[in-house]
A protein has these predicted regions:
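Acidic, low-complexity terminal tails and accessory targeting/binding regions
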Residues: 1-4, 83-95, 151-188
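Phosphate-coordination/substrate-recognition cap region in phosphate-metabolizing enzymes
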Residues: 3, 39-100, 104
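Residue-level preference for the first positions of well-ordered beta-strands
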Residues: 6, 134-140
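Loop-to-helix element that buttresses phosphate recognition and phosphoryl-transfer chemistry
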Residues: 6-64, 111-124
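Glycine-rich phosphate-binding loop signature in dinucleotide/nucleotide-binding domains
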Residues: 46-49, 130-135
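Short, well-ordered beta-to-alpha junction loops that form the rim of enzyme active sites
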Residues: 56-58, 79, 140-144, 186
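Short glycine/proline- and acidic residue-enriched helix-loop micro-motifs
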Residues: 98-118
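GST superfamily/GST-like fold recognition
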Residues: 143-147, 177
């Protein structure tokens, strides 16, 4: 028997993701293209048996989970909600750099934004839970939170997620190489 995998699914496209606006807690719906991306995950996920499906409570992740065929077993997990961008919510990187020269989400938190220490604190209990899984788990969530989750999974600090580009409607896989936690596939 092979070791369990944790499949990460980023939600499909939204108007804000398409327009490169930072979308944290604002509950923006999927576009038609986003719904198509989510539905395209269904045959890929149907090849596997998942013991659990976890999803962010935000509508774009829940709808992606539903269209991908796992909505009937989805567990809403608040720790999977996207980062709270504070004053950066709804803004583009270019707009933020006008205000904060050299700004990146990974290096320059904006006022009232969630810190990476806070993000790590909410993800660590979930990671401990996933380390004990005895079957494949599907997780439906958001770009930055999934990138941070993957970085923490392989022992990097949260900001290590800056090295892991993740497009909408894509799958990634976390797992083990013997006893070592690894990224088995990314952004496929």
């Amino acid at each position: 028997m092979s070791a369990p995998e944790i499949l990460l699914a980023r939600h499909g496209e939204t108007e804000w993701s398409r327009d490169l606006r930072h979308t944290g807690r604002t509950d923006v719906p999927l576009t038609e293209r986003g719904r198509e991306q989510a539905a395209a995950l269904r045959p890929r996920l149907a090849e596997r048996e998942f013991t659990r499906a976890l999803t962010s409570p935000l509508a774009r992740a829940r709808e992606t989970c539903e269209l991908a065929g796992l909505g009937d077993r989805a567990e809403l997990r608040p720790e999977l909600v996207e980062l709270d961008y504070g004053d950066a919510e709804g803004m583009t990187t270019d707009q933020l750099r006008e205000r904060y020269p050299g700004w990146t989400i990974w290096t320059h938190p904006t006022p009232s934004a969630e810190t990476f220490d806070e993000v790590e604190a909410r993800l660590n209990p979930l990671i401990a839970e996933l380390q004990q899984t005895d079957g494949d788990v599907a997780i439906f969530a958001h770009g930055h939170i999934l990138r941070v989750l993957a970085a923490l999974w392989i022992g990097l600090p949260p900001q290590g997620g800056s090295r892991l580009a993740l497009a909408t409607g894509k799958l990634s896989a976390l797992g083990w190489e013997r006893e070592t936690q690894v990224i088995r596939a990314w952004n496929t």
